[in-house]
Every structure is written in C-alpha cells, then in structure tokens.
From Swiss-Prot:
Lineage: Bacteria, Pseudomonadati, Bacteroidota, Flavobacteriia, Flavobacteriales
Positions with a binding annotation for ATP: G618, P619, N620, M621, S622, G623, K624, S625
Entry-linked SUPFAM superfamilies: DNA repair protein MutS, domain I, DNA repair protein MutS, domain II, DNA repair protein MutS, domain III, P-loop containing nucleoside triphosphate hydrolases
Family of the protein in this entry: Belongs to the DNA mismatch repair MutS family.
Biological processes, Gene Ontology terms: mismatch repair
Source organism of this protein record: Flavobacterium psychrophilum (strain ATCC 49511 / DSM 21280 / CIP 103535 / JIP02/86)
Function summary: This protein is involved in the repair of mismatches in DNA. It is possible that it carries out the mismatch recognition step. This protein has a weak ATPase activity.
Name of the gene this protein is made from: mutS
Matches recorded under PANTHER family: DNA MISMATCH REPAIR PROTEIN MSH1, MITOCHONDRIAL, DNA MISMATCH REPAIR PROTEIN MUTS FAMILY MEMBER
Name listed for the protein in its UniProt record: DNA mismatch repair protein MutS
GO function term, MF aspect, one: mismatched DNA binding
HAMAP family from the UniProt entry: MutS (MF_00096)
Length: 866
C-alpha cells in the first residue's frame, strides 16, 4: 500500500517516519480523540468503513486525503478493516499531551492482521483463528499453526498432499511463506489463502530453535516431542518471529507446542474433505455435517468438536472410551442436564486467560473468568462421583482454582465496569487510601448538591443547576429569563442561546478537591487492577487445563444430546476389516426432509473376503450418492467417538477414507471435469491400504461412453486385484460393469431400487442385491420438464441403441478380464448409428455404380451436417 510522502508539519513528518516502517499496513494514527488515516490508507478506509473522505491542507501543495473515526469506536471499525484482508498498524500516543510542550511521542502498539488478533469482533467464538507458517524443505514441507487468541500451537511436516490436507482442515486466516517460495506456494496450494511473505533468513533452523527454546525457557525441544521435525521447527520459529514483529510480545499463554501426529488420525485428502461437506461447502446455503452434529454449549467445545471432525481417531481404545462416556450420560440424563446447565455458564476460558497474558482483559471479563471457574466446581463434584472411569478422570483433573476465585471475589466489585477507566472496579476494603479518596469524592459531590440548593433559594432561581464539562470544570447554569437575578460576584464563563454559565470561587475550590481525589482514585484503581491481572497470569496453565477438559466434556455431551435427539446407536469397534451397517441413515439429509417423511435406511456390508467391492447401479436421483456419503459419515462419526445414525454398526478401524463423489470442474485452473476426476482417482489408487474405505461415484462420466466404461472397469479391477483389497462402494450408471462379477469374485452387484409404473418411475431409495438393467434417464428428464419432442426423439434413439449394443460387445469375450474388446460399430453417436443402418441395409449385388455413388454422396452430406 504505497502512500505519497507528505512533507509538511511536525505531525506529518512524524506520520511519514512511522508509515515508512509499515508500508504494507493501513496506519491508524492517533491524533487527540481520533484515529486518522492519510493518503491511500484514507481512500481505502473510507470505502471499507463507509466514513467521510476529506482533505488535509486542501488547496495547498501538501494536500492529502484524510479519513478518521473517534478512538473509542476502534472495536467497531478495526474488525471491518481486518475482515477486508488489511494489515492494520495501530499507532497510539505514548505520553500524556498535557505533560509535553513539543509534539506527542507516538508509536505502533499493535499490528493486527487476519491471522493475529485478540479482538472479539474479529474472532468467531466457535472457530479458531489460525495463523499458519510454511517451510519448503528439500524433500518435505514443514507447517505450523498458532491461534494467538487461545494459545494453541501445533506443528507437523510431510509431503505436499498431507500439508494440503492440514491447510484445508485448519483453514488458517493467514499463512506466512518465505519470499523465495512465493511461486512454489501458489503452484502447490493455490491462491485461495491470504499469504504474507517473510524474508528468507527467518526460515533458518538454528534461529527457529533458539527462538522456540527462548520462548518456552527450555534447553531443547525434546520435551515437546518435536525435536526431529526440523522443517516443522523452522515453520514454528517463523510464527514467533512474526508475533514479535506485530508487537505481540506478551505471549506467556503460549505454554506448549504439540505435534500433529499424521499416523494417529484417519487420512482424508482434500477431495474427501470437500466431497463429504464436513464443515465447508461450495454452496453457501448448504447444511454441513458440523451444522448437524454441533450441540456444544461452550466456545471451547465448539472449536474442539471441529478439530475432532477434521482429525478422526484410529486408536480403538480412545474411541471406545469416548463411546463409553456418551453411553454413561445417555443412561444418566439427570446428570447430563446438570452438567449441561453448568457448561452454559462457562465463558470462553481459553480466550479470557489469553487476554490476561496479553494484559488486555477488562474488569468485567475477569468477573466472567471467576464465574466460569465457579461453574466448574459442581461439574468436578458430579464427575468425581461418577462410576464411569473416564468421567472420573476428568473430575480429578479439573483444577478448583480456589485461591484465584477468592482473590477475584475480594478484589473486584461484582458489577465491575467494561473498562477500568469507568471507575469503581476495585472493591471497598482493599486499599485504605482508595476508600478515603472515594469518601472525599462522594462528600464533595454531596456538598455541590448543597451549594446548588442554597444558591437556588438565595437567588430565587428555581431552575439553577450545577454541571460539569471538560473545558472549564464545574459551573452554574442559569436560563436567560433569570439572568437579572445573578449575583455580581459570579463570574460569567459562557453564553448560550437560552442560558448563561457562571463559576464562583467556592465552586473552583471544591472542584480542585473533587477532581484531585478522582484523579488519584483512577491512578490507584489502575495500579491495583494491573497487579491483579499480573497475579492471575500465574494461573494460566491451570485455567488452560480446565478449558481443555471442559471442551472435551462438552464435545462428549454434544454427542450424547445428538444421540438422544436423533436415535443414534453406539457403534461396536472390533479388530476385523469388515464394515457392517444395519439400516444406516445420512445424518444431514434425514434432518432436511419434510416433517413426516421418513429417511429410507440402508444396509451396507463390506469386508476383504467375500464382498470387498459393491457395484451400485441405479438411475440419477435414486440415492446412490447419498448411500456412499452416509457410509463415510457413519464411519467418521464412529471414529470421532460419536454414536451413529443406524440400527447397528459393527466395524474394524478405518485408517483412510477416499471419496470421488460427483464432478466438480476446476475451470479456473484450466482443468476439465474428466481431468479433475482422474487426478482425484489417481490420488486414491496411489494411497490405498488394507483398512481403507473407498467411495467412487460415476467414475469416467466426463468422457465418451467407451472411454468411461473402460476406465471405470479398469479402476474397479485394480481395486479388486490390489493386495490391500480396500473396502469399496462403486456407484455407476454403466450397467455393463455388472458383468464384472462373473470373473471377479469379491465384487457384488447391488442396485438402488426403482418401481417402474406405466409411464413414470418411483424411486424407492432402497439398496437391494442384483444389478440394474436400466438407467431411467429419460424418465428423469421427463420429471425435470424436458420438452416432449426431445423425449420422443430420445426414446427412438434409445431403442435403436439397445437393439444394436450387446453386452458382449462392451465387456469383451466373457471371462477374459485382461482384454476388453470394444466393437468398432458400437459408437455412441446416433448419426453414426443411422449411417451404419443405411450401409447394412444396402444390397451390394443389385446396386449399380451410379446408385452407389449417389448413396455415397448422401452419406457424405449426412456427415457434413454433423
């Protein structure tokens, strides 16, 4: 963001010097009671904020654009600038203007960026605001994520695909990238992220290690389990450097850094995350899985639930433990309600204690902190009495913070103000001098009321009143109708339209006493409040621990409420490779159906021995895609620790979920539907394991029929013959694939049943054994309102195609799976079919040369019209 240099007053000289240090930020420059922006910054700010754009020095050579707003409105305007993608440098007055005869000293006190903010208006309570950092190593990429508002700090490293998955899951608001890798970043991860490019020297291992160990006050990083993640360490060091550069130096709430262990969680590539619409959708109005399952009652719980959804577990012991807690609360709903009522009273503990660390917490927010800690005590007591071991462990681990709660209770007034400057935050009895000064202030105000009453009676001016303003302090206001009654010793200070204002010696004397007391009161309150905040900061770790435990409990209780509301059942996790779902339902679709319309549940059974790949045929709109998605979502929910929408589920752990559901063109990157489809499918085929779940829908539909059939056949065969033998659901409209069961024993044919009535079809949406012989595409077109003439033509062409296309021509010689022969005449163009009919109907023995030439010319004309 370039700003034309302005050579003028000392103020503008000071502005220019500061602006040069932050050329790419919008500089909010404090001038008196306003934050001002100048030049290009002013033009941008006025557009984004809808504030007036004026000129400073209008008509002079130093004329520049100017836009500003009152300093007390910063929490209204700052979020709008940040959400517009701007980096905002807040430049404050660093000294009291009354105490200096020269220009006030100013400096940037905070640089707020999309990924670095503690402003509640910028943040979303149930969503982390992650700042990410990327380091491109020789073979692997390091990544780090930090939410400065909660203190969560995570790192990992891996190949491009893994890092891409993490970026999709964590959705950082801003990503730090080395300048030398600007092109690499855009090439590998696209340009949908808000990136900021740092100098390359920041990304050095020695510098990063030193930065991290200095922050955590340790000799090494072994205790965090990340010492071998060289690329992850480098990325993490860059994040701490960036915090320092943005003037975020009070970060003692960042107490640890955790490794994201790739092998601990279910693998889902970005295609799967997108296709299943877990928490994002290309359609802004679509309902996601998170929208349905989030019954959390606290901000911490909401953020943790999203993390659990992004990173489902593979550890059967932990999964079963979560299921047991859900079952316990489901069976003890009286206790469930008591815990829910307490969690509702808990504020955002993570972000409150982070504000304590940064010194940005208000008196009222400290009261919220205390009330939240109070609400934890009954939860701790209930949990300790529980016969359920995991619940008891949570109760045992919760910190009662008795001293902290008592300290806040005795130090602050229960009705503490939103800002310390508002006064009356500190409770009585804490500081003798403060109590004395408050007494003077209160008595002084009573005395002023006495003066008002006395002077009113003495002068006979009943409407006389004593007021105060910042210009000339306390004054007596008299309406013009009583002006003639004013005593001569009163001193006139101001004339208004309907009144005049006066001061007296007595008023000035008491004003000095009162204002002196109030100024001293403010100083003492500020001092005591700062001491309290520093003392609370010693409790950062216990409060963060409580926040984490309450978040876990909130997630598990959310699962319980979900199960109660929607009749979910506990999945049985075993050591097998099988997946056995009885009457499974789609958790999102079933909630979108009109009242009274039941969701048609379906069974799905997959294993590696008898039914490894289910080939599902059926028309469009019949529900094939829903069955595929619901299978994946049931597995995901189970491995998050939730109950599932089914009659029963027995399953072995799934370690990877792959989906290719529906076509989604990546036009902006110049890729066709078919190319995108092949890229996604290649990702699956290159990463499958023996515990993978593969869901393929309409593979090959982005190309011609024969290419499509060939590719779909080859992929299905590859999955069947692969040593991993991954469990697979394969939905297709290529009915020719039903013939694969004759040569590939672990493939079974199913179809989504359709009832064919006289001239319409009824979608039953039930998965039944056996292949489907028709696609009912013309029926679907009719339901969509296709013109009758088009439908009639389609029927005619369909009959002709069905007459001439044999199954053997498509599947090749039966039983020969290695050599699929496609007949040269089985072309999917109706015109070519018509020409073929013309040629086959010719009687060559009776055809004259002229007739032959005429027929050839006719065929040529037909082709030239094509």
């Amino acid at each position: 963001m370039s700003t034309k240099e302005i050579k003028e007053t000392p103020l503008m000289k000071q502005y220019n010097e500061i602006k040069r240090k932050y050329p790419d930020a919008c500089l909010l420059f404090r001038v008196g009671d306003f934050y001002e922006t100048f030049g290009d910054d002013a033009v941008r700010a006025s557009k984004i904020l809808g504030i007036t754009l004026t000129k400073r020095g209008a008509g002079s050579p130093t004329e520049t654009a100017l836009a500003g707003f009152p300093h007390h409105s910063i929490n209204t305007y700052l979020p709008k600038l940040v959400k517009a993608g701007l980096r905002v440098a807040i430049c404050d007055q660093l000294e009291d203007p009354k105490m200096t005869k020269t220009i006030v000293k100013r400096g940037v006190t905070e640089l707020v960026t999309p990924g670095v903010s503690m402003n509640d208006e910028v943040l979303n309570s149930k969503t982390n605001n992650f700042l990410a950092s990327i380091y491109f190593g020789k073979k692997i990429i390091g990544v780090s994520f930090l939410d400065v508002s909660t203190g969560e700090f995570l790192t990992s490293e891996g190949n491009e695909e893994y890092i891409d998955k993490l970026l999709q899951n964590f959705s950082p608001s801003e990503i730090l990238v080395p300048k030398q890798n600007k092109g690499d970043f855009k090439e590998k991860f696209g340009d949908n992220f808000h990136a900021f490019y740092l100098e390359d020297w920041v990304y050095k291992e020695d510098y990063a290690t030193e930065t991290l160990t200095n922050h955590f006050q340790t000799n090494s990083l072994k205790g965090f389990g990340i010492e071998e993640l060289a690329s992850g360490i480098i990325a993490s060091g860059a994040i701490l450097y960036y915090l320092s550069e943005t003037q975020h130096n009070k970060i003692q709430h960042i107490t640890s850094i955790h490794r994201i262990a790739e092998d601990a969680y279910v693998w889902m590539d970005r295609f799967t995350i997108r296709n299943l619409e877990l928490y994002h959708s290309y359609n802004p109005n679509a309902v996601t899985l998170l929208d349905i399952i989030d019954k959390t009652l606290s901000p911490m719980g909401g953020r943790m639930l999203k993390r659990w959804l992004a990173l489902p577990l593979k550890n059967a012991t932990i999964i079963k433990s979560r299921h047991e807690v859900v079952a316990y609360f489901k069976d003890h709903q009286e206790i469930l309600q008591k815990v829910q009522n307490q969690i509702k009273q808990i504020s955002d503990l993570e972000r409150l204690i982070s504000k304590v660390a940064a010194g940005r917490i208000s008196p009222r927010e400290i009261i919220y902190l205390k009330e939240s800690l109070d609400a934890i005590i009954p939860i701790k007591e209930l949990a300790l009495k529980s016969p359920q071991e995991a619940v008891k462990v949570i109760g045992d681990s919760l910190h009662s913070c008795d001293l902290l709660r008592e300290k806040i209770k005795t130090t602050l007034n229960q009705e503490a103000p939103v800002a310390i400057s508002k006064g009356n935050a500190i409770a009585a009895g804490i500081h003798p001098e403060l109590d004395e000064l408050r007494g003077i202030s209160a008595l002084g105000k009573e005395y002023l009321e006495g003066i008002e009453k006395r002077e009113s009676e003495k002068t006979g001016i009943s409407s006389l009143k004593i007021s105060f303003n910042n210009v000339f302090g306390y004054y007596i206001e008299v309406r013009n109708t009583h002006k003639d009654k004013v005593p001569t010793e009163w001193i006139r200070k101001q004339t208004l339209v309907n009144a005049e204002r006066y001061i007296t010696e007595e008023l000035k004397e008491y004003e000095t006493k009162i204002l002196g007391a109030e100024e001293k009161i403010q100083q003492i309150e500020n001092q005591l409040f700062e001491q309290l905040v520093s003392w609370i900061a010693t409790y950062i770790k216990p409060v963060q621990l409580n926040a984490n435990l309450i978040a876990q409990l909130d997630c598990l209780i959310s699962f319980t409420q979900l199960a109660i509301d929607n009749k979910y059942v506990c999945p049985q996790i075993n050591d097998s490779f099988a997946l056995d779902i009885k009457n499974g339902r789609h958790p999102v679709i079933e909630k979108q159906l009109p009242i009274g319309v039941p969701y048609i549940a379906n069974d799905v059974y997959l294993d590696r021995d008898t039914q490894q790949l289910i080939m599902i045929t059926g028309p469009n709109m019949s529900g094939k895609s829903a069955i595929l998605r619901q299978t994946a979502l049931i597995v995901l929910l189970a491995q998050m620790g939730s109950f599932v929408p089914a009659e029963s589920v027995q399953m072995g752990i799934v370690d990877k979920i792959f989906t290719r559901v529906g076509a989604s063109d990546n036009i902006s990157m110049g890729e066709s539907t078919f190319m995108v489809e092949m890229n996604e499918t290649a990702s699956i085929l290159n990463n499958i394991s023996d515990r993978s779940l593969v869901l393929l829908d309409e593979i090959g539909r982005g190309t011609s029929t024969y290419d499509g059939v060939s590719i779909a056949w080859a992929i299905a065969e590859f999955l069947h013959e692969n040593p991993a033998q991954p469990k697979t659901l394969f939905a297709t409209h290529y009915h020719e694939l039903n013939e694969m069961t004759e040569s590939l024993p672990r493939i079974q044919n199913y179809n989504v049943s359709v009832k064919e009535l006289k001239d319409t079809v009824l979608f039953i949406r039930k998965l039944v054994k056996g292949g489907s012989a028709h696609s009912f595409g013309i029926h679907v077109a009719k339901m969509a309102g296709m013109p009758q003439i088009v439908l009639q033509k389609a029927e005619k062409i369909l009959k002709k195609l069905e007459k001439n296309h044999s199954a053997e021509a498509l599947s090749g010689t039966k039983g020969n799976k290695d050599d699929i022969q496609l007949s040269i005449f089985n072309l999917d163009d109706p015109l070519l079919e018509e020409i073929k009919e013309e040629i086959l109907n010719l009687d060559i023995n009776t055809l004259t040369p002229v007739e032959a030439l005429m027929k050839l010319n006719e065929i040529k004309r037909m082709l030239s019209k094509k």
